[in-house]
Amino acid sequence: MSRFQRVAVLGSTGSIGESTLDVIARHPEQLAVFALSAHSRIERLAEQAAASAAAVVVVPDAAARQRFLAAWPAGRTPPEIRVGAQALADTAADAACDTVMAAIVGAAGLPAALAAAQAGKRVLLANKEALVAAGALFMRAVRANGAELLPIDSEHNAIFQCLPHEGRASAPEQPARGVRRLILTASGGPFRRHDPLDLHEVTPDQACAHPNWSMGRKISVDSATMLNKGLEVIEAHWLFAMPPERIEVLIHPQSVVHSMVEYDDGSVLAQLGQPDMRTPISYGLGFPERLASGVGPLDLARWGRLEFETPDLRRFPCLQLAFDALRAGQAACVALNAANEVAVDAFLSGRLRYTWISRVIAAALEWQQRQSSVTLDSLADVLALDAATRAYAGNLGLA
């Protein structure tokens, strides 16, 4: 990495955002914070902005702006405060910004991620919805505007590192030459050994108790259901131009092998490392060079053994639903994601049983298939279908 980079961290108070700021702080000679954004943890945003000397912060509304100013250290000049969703997209495209960490969870992060791609930025993509809900649209924007796309999910980042170097960050339209298949690994979450019949009474706290990773509550539930892995299958399809029949999922409880690439000659390349998101984040920030991340060395002798197994689709029906949606097309993927967000929100707030998350998604996919054909040629088209699916899922009487 030869040039100095000013980074916008969108979703800075989440786990990815916090880890990103940790890595940036380790390399003041190469990286600086341009902008930060948060939705609800405004006091933490003020702490981050003060510590990182951010030039800009983005908050959702006027009330959040007042909260930010109230939390700002007395006697210090505050950063520029921008307000609203359009301000978020404008900040992602700002000429003063070189790199955008797109780490806002959910469909709310899609417009800003797309704006960054359209502005030709280096996009560090941690927001799944940009590809799950708008894969074709997003990849076209990357190609048309000369943006760089570096996946930050540990699995996709691992695959990226194991692929041939040519064109990896430029939204390829064909699978990399010589690659037979992609193998995504999954921890299996907290219920890997549970009988499916015992999952009916699962509580939100149980679902959020991930054995290996420290994550937010929504993504922790997605990991427990393996819908998260299903979304990653869809992402891998778009990131690496790989058809679904050449993408496989394996449960790997130790979360040491982050994913693998199998080549036509039978070789399998894997990326291993500690389960710490600072590794893929530092890779994205430093690409094509490598930066120190603060992650300790991997002691394979301590691990002793690494296990792999095929996922049980009776225990993880959401994974099968994701493959079904990918084969059905982009509209089904939009419906899958929207229905899951509604269902997980209902589960976390105590309005839906854990085992009904997959039922809400399945019902939404059936509903989407009954609709007249839709075109998803613009962000407005995607967001309209997203909203319609949310309304349908919310009216099921299940959420």
UniProtKB/Swiss-Prot annotation:
Names of required cofactors = Mg(2+); Mn(2+)
Write the record's keywords in alphabetical order, separated by commas.
Isoprene biosynthesis, Manganese, Metal-binding, NADP, Oxidoreductase
Q: Does the keyword NADP apply?
A: yes
What general EC class does the enzyme of this chain belong to? oxidoreductase
Q: Which Gene Ontology BP annotations are present?
A: isopentenyl diphosphate biosynthetic process, methylerythritol 4-phosphate pathway involved in terpenoid biosynthetic process
Query: For NADPH, which residues are the binding ones?
Result: T13, G14, S15, I16, N127, E129, G216
Chain positions recorded as 1-deoxy-D-xylulose 5-phosphate binding sites: K128, S154, E155, S187, H210, S223, N228, K229, E232
**Disulphide bridges:** none
What reaction does this catalyse? 2-C-methyl-D-erythritol 4-phosphate + NADP(+) = 1-deoxy-D-xylulose 5-phosphate + NADPH + H(+)
Q: Which domain of life is it from?
A: Bacteria
List residues binding Mn(2+).
D153, E155, E232
User: What EC number(s) would the UniProt record show?
Assistant: 1.1.1.267
> What GO molecular function annotations does the UniProt record carry, in alphabetical order?
1-deoxy-D-xylulose-5-phosphate reductoisomerase activity; manganese ion binding; NADPH binding
* Listed pathway(s): Isoprenoid biosynthesis; isopentenyl diphosphate biosynthesis via DXP pathway; isopentenyl diphosphate from 1-deoxy-D-xylulose 5-phosphate: step 1/6
What Pfam families does the database record attribute to this sequence?
DXP_redisom_C, DXP_reductoisom, DXPR_C
Q: What does this protein do?
A: Catalyzes the NADPH-dependent rearrangement and reduction of 1-deoxy-D-xylulose-5-phosphate (DXP) to 2-C-methyl-D-erythritol 4-phosphate (MEP).
Q: What name does UniProt use for this protein? A: 1-deoxy-D-xylulose 5-phosphate reductoisomerase
UniProt source species: Bordetella petrii (strain ATCC BAA-461 / DSM 12804 / CCUG 43448)
